[in-house]
Amino acid sequence: MTRPAVFLDRDGTLIEEAGYLDRLERLVFFPYSVDAVRALNRSGFAVVIVTNQAGIARGIFKEPFVAEAHGYITRRLAAGGAHIDGFYYCPHHPDGKVEAFTKACECRKPAPGMLTAAAADLDLDLSKSFMIGDRWHDLAAGAAVGVRGVLVRTGYGRTEEASPKEVTPAAIVDNLVDAVSWILRES
């Protein structure tokens, strides 16, 4: 059963931008995030987080913390009747300090590796899918595999909107709930 997905950037899109999120106390949901994810769940979309986590390569935090943060997100969404179908993260950065994660890779956005991995794992139809993010490189990852992108003005979005476009978005909206409303109208 191939189904469409909505790929979500994590920081600045689903949750507030906190720089390198290295403690759960700094993980703050936008007030509308649970409702937005639940609306996507009910509409039949797979909801997949795709997030660059260069803090691992830079030695700021370790991989178990990413799993802990994603567990917290899962529990918080479940309490509101919502869920994420898959979490994908890239631990790499070409200028890292931790040798095992210091490299150029195909998973770090704007490369589409996390999206293609999710599509294979979850049997997703990329041609009917969307990418929501607050940075041009989020949307570029989607565009590389034919996924339409929606830029949100939360996180780095307002700054990105004012900078030269790396990719042409299908829409630019204020926040995640507006992006979900736009997607549900378009599909």
Predicted segments, located by residue:
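Structural recognition of alpha->loop->beta junctions
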Residues: 70-89, 162-184
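Active-site neighborhood of HAD-like aspartate-dependent phosphohydrolases
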Residues: 1-49
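Acidic, Mg2+-coordinating phosphoryl-transfer loop and its flanking beta/alpha structural elements
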Residues: 127-171
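Substrate-recognition element of Asp-dependent hydrolases with the DxDx(T/V) motif
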Residues: 33, 37-73, 82-96, 142
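Conserved Lys-Pro-Asp/Glu-containing loop-to-beta segment of HAD-superfamily phosphomonoesterases
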Residues: 106-139
